[in-house]
Amino acid sequence: MFKTVFFTFFFILSALFTVATHANEAKHAIAVGAEQFALYLPQLKNKRVGLVVNQTSLVGQTHLVDSLLAKNINITKIFAPEHGFRGDHDAGAHVKNAVDSKTGIALISIYGKNKKPSAKVLSDVDIIIFDIQDVGVRFYTYISSMHYMMEAAAEQGVEFIVLDRPNPNIAYVDGPLLEPEFKSFVGIHPIPVLHGMTVGELAKMIKGEGWINQARDLKLNVIPVAGYTRTTPYSLPVKPSPNLPNDQSIALYPSLCFFEATPISIGRGTDFAFQVIGYSPVALGEFSFTPRSIKGAALNPKFKNQMVKGIDLRHSDTVGLNLNYLINAYQQLTQAKQLFFERADFMDKLAGTDKLRLAIEAGHSAEEIKQSWQAGLKQFKQQRVPYLLY
């Protein structure tokens, strides 16, 4: 009896160890585009290089800027997207032009008034490298910055290299396709909320579908992620922005970002942003939290220094796009005669259409709403096939 139990226990331990080992091996087998110097360094020789980078642009533990400087690459400009070069600016906070104190290289903001660099700014740039970790959601603005940088490169005859990285939400394609009249910086391309593509794949699609001016003129090179597939698990080594601190927040982001157009808090001003929802005076649940001012993440969060009650989603298994949180909160506030879509225009920009908001206001269920965009998703999935790398 003892021997049988022992061997059963040993077998289970061995199986668990094997699974863990294989998972670790899979993680270590991945080489992001930036790590594959042999595939792009020859292109940079004797060229003036501009980098679109932030805190996620790492080669192992070393920033791409430092890695390239150590290899004597001539970096003339660093272009900073939303949240800044160091990733220490709150969402929507102004990013200023500056000079990097460590390297002396000019920092050019591409978030704010000047989202697309002028011919003058690019006059000393031969090649632009884009290396930023994305999360696979249309309204996450790094892909909008990539769009404008690609367009500027095409117009000025500058080469464009994308050093690809995994998409933590690559398994999901969901949400309405963006309609042209709702185009904005939080949604430029006619793609779903969750597009299931890496930035490299999306760059190929932007060029191939002619979504930028002079798309045919753009010399684009994508360095794929080695050892990566659409089923490869990937945990981000660095938080991609101040309010997406972990894998759980990234998984919930597509579902909770719509609350930004409402009076409801999604936890900005806490250590668990995009992992909770809360409101006052209407209690959305039993969980309570109090947002505080956090420099570089949430200086003036909703309900600053006020306790709100709602739902703790830190241990939920939500993935993809879940509309029930939004629909349930709408019903609770409406019953209490509280205005829900207080920023209706912004809601429609996030959704890429007014149909989602109108359907919620009309009382449609999540299943009915999702059914309404299935034809568009089917068309998109077919359209993207030529551009997929994994």
Q: Could you tell me what each predicted segment is?
A:
Residues 76-82, 163:
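Short internal beta-strands
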Residues 1-27:
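Bacterial Sec-dependent N-terminal signal peptides
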Residues 273, 277-372:
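Conserved functional hotspot residues or short segments at active or partner-binding sites
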Residues 134-146:
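Glycine/threonine-rich flexible loop motifs
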Residues 96-125:
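Glycine-rich oxoanion-binding loops at beta->alpha junctions
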Residues 183-254:
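Conserved anion/nucleotide-ligand pocket segment
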Residues 87-92, 161-183:
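Glycine-rich, charge-decorated loop segments at or immediately adjacent to ligand/cofactor-binding or catalytic sites
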Residues 226-303:
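Glycine-rich, aromatic-lined ligand/substrate-binding cores of catalytic
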